[in-house]
Amino acid sequence: MIIPCWESRSIARPNRLLTMSNELNTAALTTLTEQYITLWNEADAAARTKLIAELWAEDGAQVLTDPPQEIREAAAAIAFPVPYLTVRGHRELDARVTRAYEMFIAPGEYTFQPLGVAQRLAGNLAGLGWAMVSTADGSIGGTGYDVLALDEDGRIRSDHQYIGPA
């Protein structure tokens, strides 16, 4: 059974994903999948901001583990290892999600879709596969896999995103 969580400041957390035993169950993983994918497809900026606050810990981070080729080449040119790209906190996460929306969803070319339901990996870790699907013909323009670490309130503490090929 999913139960709501209330912080001492009396802010309701109705989207809590952990059960009374602090384990991720099928219902929690389904909810996580739906909310996470909805966030990246959401057209309304205020709704995106609200979803980020519901899904993510205040200091939550997303780490892009395999940055775009031009960034990898620039790092290699100055003898640096390939860098991870990290955004932290609700404001930076909002900017990251908004930019992805503007690039891929707003033009009407793609939509993000889950590749099944998130899977419990270990403890409070979940893995979520997704695809960027063409609205024109249903072809896959790209895929990814996110490893999400949830905090004690069931919000995302960290998200390590691995971008895959189409």
Where does each model-flagged region fall?
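Short hydrophobic transmembrane-like helices used for membrane targeting/insertion
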Residues: 1-3, 11
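C-terminal and inter-domain tail/linker signature
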Residues: 5-7, 17-166
